Amino acid sequence: MSLREFRKAGHPPTLAAAFLYFDVSFMVWVLLGPLAPFLAESLKLTATQKGVLTAIPLLGGSFFRPILGWMTERYGGRRTGLIGLSVSLIPLALGWQLANTYGQFLALGLLLGVAGASFAAALPLASGWYPPEHQGLAMGIAGAGNSGTLLATLFAPRLAQALGWHSVFGIAMVPVCLVWIAFFLMAKDAPGARVTKQWKDYASILKEADSWWFCFIYSITFGGFVGLASYLSVFFHDQYHLTKVQAGDFTTVVVLFGSFLRPVGGMLADRLGGYRMLLVLLTGIAVCLAGVAMLPPAMAALGLLAGAMAMMGMGNGSVFQLVPQRFVGRVGILTGVVGAAGGFGGFLLPSALGAIKDRTGTFGLGFAVLAFVALAGAGALLGIGRIWRSQWDAESARRAGLYTGGEACEGYAAAE
């Protein structure tokens, strides 16, 4: 696959629009994370409360993602994206003008989940323009919009320190409005009749065991990425006593690796197979998080977390290289379901780290638990791969990278 072939295969303006939509939505979705040290100081929050505060938008994202997935199937990704961007302005306006208590911020955080639900519209919008052999890179580029997290972690602490945290919410409305205009002008739904799904279709897809495996793996890769992106400002500030701005900068460095390596993960998954990639990546994530569990010096923790996030980002691209191979014609629905699982995994991560910190006085045990979950994911994937090899058609199995060694030759022959 060459980049020239990739450009000719789809619709670059729509791919760019999907990226921008996802990017600014991610910025909004995780905004409470880099602001958490400021809010915790102002509201006198415990470690558990800080964990829940940074996690609640992720729970909101889990709730709204199936809804936006259904809307994408029914109304198209373009219209759904415009609605999502419009609704995302509401919690920003509330944070700017009204929110002053912990309870109000929890309600605001749930509404921020609409921005997190952008996943269910942006990825099918981009995916619809590209054939299966280009899905990994297309989904990776659109999904690299999770780099919007960088905008939040880099600028939100500085703006909060200079202008007050209320102002940050108002300022964030500006890029949302600009992206709305760009999305309106650039995005275009892929040709072809849309097949409208009913809520029973979501229930039906959940009856298939493979959908649960995708949910579990994605809750580790994407859930780990967004959960850490939202919580690391608190971790660096509380564990290493960095200033609020320094904690945001450390988080920015970590998120940088995960965001921009997502397309690389998609590209490698197109060539090597998403299954093969995930086996390596999940194991690597477990090793890095186990290192963080030892609470090494700040710079060592920074390097280990950057490594973990890089592999989580590549894992996100790899998961969605697998989805079209297994669920042909149902990418929109499964994207919503799997995305919801990823968001829920992200919600559990900060909540668990905060609660464990309150009960044990250390972050170490929390990161050890995360390492174990990642390793369990690799083990589960290794086992389910044997079943997939016997159930999937030869061409899909070949693209997924389910064949190894001599099996690869047999798989290629069967596909031909």
Regions of interest found by a model, annotated:
Residues L108-G145:
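Cytoplasmic helix-loop-helix junction between adjacent transmembrane helices
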Residues M173-A193, G377-G385:
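C-terminal membrane-cytosol helix-exit motif in multi-pass small-molecule transporters
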Residues V30, L58-P66, A117, T149-L151, ...:
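Residue-level signature of mid-helix packing/kink "hotspots" within the transmembrane helices
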Residues L272-V319:
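C-terminal transmembrane helical hairpin of 12-TM major facilitator-type secondary transporters
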Residues L32-A36, D210-F260:
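Extracytoplasmic gate region of multi-pass secondary transporters
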Residues F63-T101, A269, Y275:
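Conserved MFS/SLC helix-loop-helix module at the cytosolic interface between two early adjacent transmembrane helices
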Residues G136-L154, G339-L349:
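Glycine-rich segments within core transmembrane alpha-helices of 12-TM secondary carriers
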Residues I141-L185:
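Helix-loop-helix hairpin linking two adjacent transmembrane segments in secondary transporters
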